[in-house]
């Protein structure tokens, strides 16, 4: 995998812990996701006024858009404790029981990658979410018995990048469902300016906008790129980040004006050069670029589709006219077997 993809990859990676100081701690400071934020503000206020736990919250969206941050903010706004784990860490029922039995009244329990929960763990959650009780089996064999243990009312916040892999029974137990969208350039520019202020580095407005355009609609990528631009500016002896610094830095990282890196362009070129622009199946495409199908679908395709460069069709993946233009290639003429490609 290319080094430039490590910079624009939306999933959390080593070094991103430095961004924790950049994360907003209240809904007022949280940029973007306006509708979700407005709705959540109402639900939180109502729950606080009634002295009740907030309904269970389900967050859906690509990685790096702020799902974990919003879960933490939810706990902050409610004034309650916050516990966090990932679904892969809940390997056995006792792992989940150990957390549920230590929750405090109305606390927020966040499970990331909730689509990866094992069936046995998921079934334990059903009763905990609905009745605030935990079924625990004591003993083995014919003498085994089930004891129901009460737990304090709590709010489960589940986050996923793959909602289609979450079972219907689990989804139905969430009272609030919010979908995260990619951020606009304006929203990302605001996030970059705020982060630059916290990092005590000046960034020109035009430079912030240029950086926002290359951040793949993702705050995590924007903050990561900002740190890299700070490095380039510092080594160049500059006291601020200007457009020239951003342009030179992005070129050095092999990131183009749309935020595409080497593998993005390789995907588009592979479809064009090897499959006449498509359609081509995801499995075949993943093999052709030497990546797993999950990586292709989770980390590459969402932004390529959102940017209007790639289409998912019932027959497979197809590039768009915009992809040809962006790569500086001539699109096929009608009659070359691509009659429906740009319809």
Swiss-Prot record:
Mg(2+) binds at residue 68. Residues 184-254 are annotated as: Small ATPAse domain (RuvB-S). Homohexamer. Forms an RuvA(8)-RuvB(12)-Holliday junction (HJ) complex. HJ DNA is sandwiched between 2 RuvA tetramers; dsDNA enters through RuvA and exits via RuvB. An RuvB hexamer assembles on each DNA strand where it exits the tetramer. Each RuvB hexamer is contacted by two RuvA subunits (via domain III) on 2 adjacent RuvB subunits; this complex drives branch migration. In the full resolvosome a probable DNA-RuvA(4)-RuvB(12)-RuvC(2) complex forms which resolves the HJ. Belongs to the RuvB family. SMART domains: AAA. GO terms for cellular component: cytoplasm; Holliday junction resolvase complex. InterPro entries: AAA+_ATPase, AAA_lid_4, DNA_helicase_Holl-junc_RuvB, P-loop_NTPase, RuvB-like_N, RuvB_C, WH-like_DNA-bd_sf, WH_DNA-bd_sf. SUPFAM superfamilies: P-loop containing nucleoside triphosphate hydrolases (SSF52540), Winged helix' DNA-binding domain (SSF46785). Residues 257-343 are annotated as: Head domain (RuvB-H). NCBIfam families: PRK00080.1, ruvB. Its EC number is 3.6.4.-. Disulfide bonds: none annotated. This is Holliday junction branch migration complex subunit RuvB. Keywords: ATP-binding, Cytoplasm, DNA damage, DNA recombination, DNA repair, DNA-binding, Hydrolase, Nucleotide-binding. It is found in: Cytoplasm. Residues 1-183 are annotated as: Large ATPase domain (RuvB-L). It catalyses: ATP + H2O = ADP + phosphate + H(+). Has 3 domains, the large (RuvB-L) and small ATPase (RuvB-S) domains and the C-terminal head (RuvB-H) domain. The head domain binds DNA, while the ATPase domains jointly bind ATP, ADP or are empty depending on the state of the subunit in the translocation cycle. During a single DNA translocation step the structure of each domain remains the same, but their relative positions change. The RuvA-RuvB-RuvC complex processes Holliday junction (HJ) DNA during genetic recombination and DNA repair, while the RuvA-RuvB complex plays an important role in the rescue of blocked DNA replication forks via replication fork reversal (RFR). RuvA specifically binds to HJ cruciform DNA, conferring on it an open structure. The RuvB hexamer acts as an ATP-dependent pump, pulling dsDNA into and through the RuvAB complex. RuvB forms 2 homohexamers on either side of HJ DNA bound by 1 or 2 RuvA tetramers; 4 subunits per hexamer contact DNA at a time. The gene is ruvB. One of its GO terms (molecular function) is ATP binding. It comes from Treponema denticola (strain ATCC 35405 / DSM 14222 / CIP 103919 / JCM 8153 / KCTC 15104). DNA binds at residues 312, 317. Residues 1-23 are annotated as: Disordered. The keyword Cytoplasm applies. The lineage of its organism: Bacteria, Pseudomonadati, Spirochaetota, Spirochaetia, Spirochaetales. ATP binds at residues 22-23, 64, 67-69, 130-132, 173, 183, 220. It comes from the Bacteria.
